[in-house]
Amino acid sequence: MPSERRSPDELDCDYMNQLHNDLRVLRAVVDEELRRRWDRSLPFADALFDRWERADQLGFGEGSSVYDSAHVFGSVAVGEETWIGPFVILDGSGAALTIGNYCDVSAGVHIFTHDTALRCVSMGQAAARRSPVSIGDGTYVG
């Protein structure tokens, strides 16, 4: 039987402190292994979770990967062997966003299928513009 959900005020401080300590130890172990094997240090979630598994869960093409820190919204399709870097935003909430095969979307890139600049500068008189975005095969974005 699942435990009853408690408010943050009701959480056991000893339990939370132990959990925090356990996570710190895990973070140190993961970071040490990354540095040893690949000479890199990543944000905890990016280091902890598998990029290829996440891409598969999102329905991206075979062999593609997406960092845990990347944000994916709306209708986004990604082809095979495509790399989506850390801190990327793929926002297909305005229309479809399609990225081809063998592409690299570099760290921090933001791709949107909508534009709200006219809505803002017109003080709401103009609507946001929405349009599909398609990035072809073999493209580097960065």
Which sequence ranges carry the predicted segments?
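Terminal amphipathic alpha-helical/low-complexity segments used for targeting or macromolecular assembly
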Residues: M1-Q57, G61-G63, Y102, T116-L118, ...
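Flexible, glycine/small-residue-enriched loop-and-beta-strand segment within the central core
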Residues: S41-D50, L58, A70-V78, W83-G142
